[in-house]
Design a protein with these regions (language model features):
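Active-site gating/metal-coordination segments in enzymes
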Residues: 83-179, 247
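Divalent metal-dependent hydrolysis catalytic cores, especially in the metallo-beta-lactamase
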Residues: 41, 56-86, 114-119, 139-144
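Mobile, glycine- and charge-enriched loop segments
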Residues: 32-49, 100-119, 239-242
Length: 323
């Protein structure tokens, strides 16, 4: 029977499970182990759920992150693409995550450990100038694109064209009924823009590892996975398609069927990239709420091969983001 959890509920349940297995470690040993290998985190935000700068820096340090890529929000505008201002890219009940300017200034001040992305509401008239302003300043990615638009709309395609011109990847949040519509026809964009590196993220991206996932409204399914879903095919068939392992959705994909997850990570070891996208202040597995830390632990458990781990945690990000 398929179950449907919210992101917060899932992470809490997964945290309890992981903390109760061999992955459970104390604070000292956890941090010590993570210092042994470099990790690039391709998915974080400033001001995420009211977490301040010092707390975010401490969180990344606790996870053992060498380099963090910060993804900005779009502007708070009252358009259909932002659900009339409710979701301009990243709004929660605690407020809005940092936009382009704030994210750029933070990364500039902490350039040793942080990089930044560029973002804009795609149907705003100045979307491309806004994005290109920050690409010229050194943004390494466009995204996270998290808007109520068709994936093949004119505005989105202009963004893909900018990504091609500046040779940066595009990171997209796929969520049925909310963000980036048309997942099943996205292959047309992959074919139209073969030089653009697209990175899939979030619930709809990860539920579709399963060939038999039919109810797209179920965002955190449990139980066995049948290989050959749309996501699996996109990664297999298109050299320019990559996957972001972050958040509760990525963690769910790894824990719901560990036998499948092991094979999936090995099969797509050159296409999957670690990200955290967690809003907690801990950064530790033992907290039970940090999806980023739980992701790291689960990946290490599933693929003990250090060469594959290095690809997932470091080399793929370094290559795709050119950092």
């Amino acid at each position: 029977m398929e179950e449907h959890y919210s992101r917060r509920d899932f992470i809490t349940k997964a945290g309890v499970f992981v903390a109760g297995t061999a992955l459970h470690v104390d604070r000292f040993s956890e941090i010590t182990r993570r210092k042994e290998e470099p990790i690039i985190d391709i998915h974080q935000h400033i001001y995420y759920n009211a977490r301040n700068d010092e707390e975010m820096i401490a969180h990344q340090k606790a996870m053992g992150i060498k380099t963090t890529i910060l993804l900005p929000a779009g502007r708070p505008v009252n358009l259909v693409s932002t659900h009339l201002g409710v979701s301009d890219g990243f709004v929660s009940k605690y407020g809005r995550v940092g936009g382009n300017a704030e994210t750029y200034l933070f990364a500039k001040e902490h350039r040793k450990s942080f990089r930044f992305g560029a973002n804009a509401v795609p149907d705003m008239p100045d979307a491309i100038p806004e994005i290109e302003k920050y690409l010229k300043l050194g943004a390494v990615v466009i995204g996270e694109l998290k808007f109520s638009v068709d994936c093949d709309s004119d505005g989105m395609q202009k963004i893909y064209q900018s990504a091609e011109a500046y040779d940066v990847p595009v990171l997209m949040h796929w969520q049925h009924g909310m963000y980036n519509y048309g997942f099943d026809r996205f292959y047309k964009m992959l074919e139209k823009y073969p030089r653009v590196k697209f990175i899939g993220h979030a619930q709809t991206w990860w539920v579709n590892i399963d060939k038999h996932h039919e109810d797209q409204s179920v965002l955190y399914p449990r139980g066995p996975v049948t290989p050959g879903g749309i996501t699996d095919r996109y990664l297999s068939d298109y050299p320019n398609m990559y996957g972001d392992l972050s958040a509760g959705s990525g963690l769910n994909a790894l824990t719901r069927d560990e036998a499948h997850a092991k094979q999936f990570l090995e099969k797509h070891q050159d296409k999957l990239i670690y990200g955290s996208d967690c809003d907690d202040k801990s950064g530790l597995v033992s907290s039970g709420v940090c999806s980023g830390a739980l992701d790291i632990a689960e990946i290490r458990k599933l693929v003990p091969d250090v060469k594959i781990q290095r690809k997932l945690f470091y080399e793929n990000a370094k290559r795709v983001f050119r950092i």
